[in-house]
Amino acid sequence: MLVGCVNRSNISNIQLISYDDSSITVDADAAQPEYGAIYHLLFRGLPNSNQTVPIISTSEEQTKQQFPAYFKTFIDNKRYQTFITSSTKNSNGSRRIVINTKALKQDLEQNSIIRKFGY
């Protein structure tokens, strides 16, 4: 299933490949595929996966305003890449990306961006 979204003025197509309790594997076709994949998980969710709803339930704008220091480091300093287990180029130019969702959620919990168990 392909999912499109606009992020950082780029259109990102994300195709779910597989998932388990601690990771999600996607193919992403965008100028910044790793960022696009993380963005989808955080603010959009991935249909037909174990993460169909966004990890962060509040709006992107509201969350970034509430936690500016965290997101400056996370996005501008590319800290999100620490949650990418693997990123390899496919023959069609897209990238196959494995995201450690367990570590990502734990980091968001430790920094009070989300609460444990979504409450």
What are these model-derived regions, one by one?
Residues 5-119:
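Domain-level marker for long, solvent-exposed, non-transmembrane regions
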